[in-house]
Amino acid sequence: MEYNTILNNTSKTRVCYFFDQDVGNYFYGPYHPMKPHRLCLTNNLVLNYGLHKKMHLYKARPADAEDMLKFHSEDYVDFLERVTPENINEWKDVKRFHIGEDCPVFPGLYDYCSIYSGGSIEGALKLNHRMYDIAINWSGGLHHARKDEASGFCYVNDIVLAILELLKFHARVLYIDIDVHHGDGVQEAFYLTDRVMTVSFHKFGGDFFPGTGDIDEIGAKTGKLYSVNVPLADGIDDKNYLNIFKPVIQGVMDYYRPSVIVLQCGADSLRFDRLGCFNLTIKGHAECVRFVKSFNIPTLVLGGGGYTVRNVARCWTYETSVCVDTEVNNELPYNDYIQFYSPDFQLIPDYTGLPFKYENANTKSYLESLRIKILENLRILQWAPSVQIQDVPPDIMPIDFDRDEDSKENMDKRKKKHNDFS
């Protein structure tokens, strides 16, 4: 009897999904918490659940130096393009680019950046041309990278590059970040403009990286009040998180009225993450995706942090099923990495009875004070900003419209061609 991985599907949402089979083969180092290999696990699960049949699969053109220069400095891009583990000692200004233990130089660094950035840029292009309702690139979402330096395991800020592309067609772009770390690189890039509203839900306080994202960071000049920060304490659970997430996002939608959304789904906000300190379940995390999706606004869905590899794969696979309106079986299908999911072999593990690593330090009164302050700031906006968009600049990447006429038969052929994700 064939194992039924899909329990229900009523999807009318047009979804495209970006994956390059090489992206999971890059290696930060033996003791580094960032493991691109998590992408291999994610995509193998997506395939074995049959979710690829509910969306169009793409291998994006890797971003080149010209693409990266839309945001990053020439010196920095040149450094990324030419530095290798073999020649790094020849560079006198490595510290200027913040290269070190957190952001090491590893074999294929530039190619890795090109691949994950290319998926985000091309996803933005397809949304711009109204080819899809949702574009997914789990390899993207590296939100800490700055204009001229690496930061927090991030080298090229694919999110900023994608938003710059979206701004060619959209007057207002909303960026939402549910990573446990503050989306500082994206906030900094758009801190002075009202055309991008950044909304970040994150741990704040003490020495927790990156140390930014207090509620009083609201933007400046034209961008004043267009940076929204929700600083949270350790141990927040699904109920408390959603009780602040939903009213804040509803308020943002009511007052800002974006025409496109970028959603960064960092999975380090999950319970038991290697570096995180929240207590979200996969279903709670995915409820944020479901809520954003309910507004029926074109959305670019990206990855981000996440350092307990098996849970990252579980989370992003489940959120892929949410994007394509498909209910999947909680029992994992057999896949190339099945041993990673021992001993339960469940998509959403049952943690009932297990002790919390972090107690919930978010009081009801504190969360309510955040909600009140943020909604007060949103009301000051009064109306959504508008701009006159004149001649639209050319796309960063050329669009091949013929690729979007793929039938289900062609999708199955593509699955066979790209079936090896190891």
From Swiss-Prot:
This is Histone deacetylase B. Pfam families: Hist_deacetyl (PF00850). Keywords: Chromatin regulator, Cytoplasm, Hydrolase, Metal-binding, Nucleus, Repressor, Transcription, Transcription regulation. GO terms for molecular function: histone deacetylase activity; histone deacetylase activity, hydrolytic mechanism; metal ion binding. The gene is hdaB. Belongs to the histone deacetylase family. HD type 1 subfamily. Substrate binds at residues 102, 152, 307. It catalyses: N(6)-acetyl-L-lysyl-[histone] + H2O = L-lysyl-[histone] + acetate. The lineage of its organism: Eukaryota, Amoebozoa, Evosea, Eumycetozoa, Dictyostelia. Residues 413-422 have a biased composition (Basic residues). One of its GO terms (biological process) is sporulation. The active site is at 144 (proton acceptor). Residues 399-422 are annotated as: Disordered. InterPro entries: HDAC_PDAC, His_deacetylse, His_deacetylse_1, His_deacetylse_dom, His_deacetylse_dom_sf, Ureohydrolase_dom_sf. Its activity is inhibited by trichostatin A (TSA), a well known histone deacetylase inhibitor. Cytosolic activity is refractory to inhibition by TSA, while the nuclear activity is inhibited completely. Disruption phenotype: Develop normally but when mixed with wild type cells they sporulate less efficiently than the wild type. Do not show major alterations in gross histone acetylation levels. Its main location: nucleus. A divalent metal cation binds at residues 179, 181, 268. It comes from Dictyostelium discoideum (Social amoeba). It is found in: Nucleus; Cytoplasm. Responsible for the deacetylation of lysine residues on the N-terminal part of the core histones (H2A, H2B, H3 and H4). Histone deacetylation plays an important role in transcriptional regulation, cell cycle progression and developmental events. Histone deacetylases act via the formation of large multiprotein complexes. May play a role in the regulation of the timing of gene expression during the development and in the definition aspects of the phenotype that mediate social behavior in genetically heterogeneous groups. Its EC number is 3.5.1.98. GO terms for cellular component: cytoplasm; nucleus.
